[in-house]
Amino acid sequence: MSPVRPPREFEDFLRRTGLVESVEVPLFTPLEGGVSSDIWKVDVADRAICVKRALAKLKVEGDWHAPVERNAFEVAWMQKAASIAPGSAPEILAHDPASGMFAMTYLDPADCKLWKSELRAGRAGPDFASRCGHVLGTIHRETAGDAEVAARFATDQIFHAIRLEPYLEATAACHADVAGRLHELSAITAANRIVLVHGDVSPKNILITADGPVFLDAE
């Protein structure tokens, strides 16, 4: 059986950024990336890395499109979060805004667990949840009212396209009896610009490691 290969752009990105030498033949393994991205584990030389590309059209039944520029803000969130709470996000190894791709450290399942899987298996406790809250609270506290952060993450259109329109406003379109309240909630959320938020804090996006939580897939 032939090995699974990603689109050519992935290998081009790796070589262009120097993560793969010209003579290397990287081994690609597809990873589960939800509906909004293509994600691959790449074995190169003596390490494994992860490469992610945002999709313009999401992998859902409906015709859901989202700006691929969101990829650059995910990178920026990870870098900012890690500068405030070291270890709270994967390390960014390379980023190409034009292609909507970035590379980050690969977190081996042998060394960490997905919080969602642990909860599904009935393994839940307050300690890890408390650590998650502490890290997020620290990020919120350190970015609250920061004009520079607000300017750097002025992503109103992207946030509307991927967080508000497909959820609150799409639900409003199907339920006229609560449409007014949902549109009001959407407007209130869009106008709330106090701290830097992750955008999709969920157990499916949080890894349990020996050093604490690692947050993935910032929106």
PLM feature spans:
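Residue-level signal for beta-strand positions within conserved beta-sheet cores that form or flank
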Residues: E21-E24, R47, S88, D211
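Short Pro/Gly-enriched beta-strand edge/turn motifs at strand-loop
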Residues: L19-P26, E74, I162, G180-A191
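ATP-binding pocket architecture of kinase catalytic cores
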Residues: L31, S36, W40-A147
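Active-site acidic catalytic loop and adjacent metal/ATP-binding pocket
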Residues: T29-A45, I49-V51, E184-E219
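Active-site catalytic-loop/activation-segment of kinase and kinase-like phosphoryl-transfer enzymes
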Residues: M1-P7, T105, T138-I188
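Juxta-kinase regulatory segment immediately upstream of eukaryotic protein kinase catalytic domains
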Residues: M1-F28
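Short, structurally constrained coil/turn elements
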Residues: S22, S83-P86, A190, T209
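Short, well-ordered amphipathic alpha-helices
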Residues: E11, A76-Q79, R181-L182
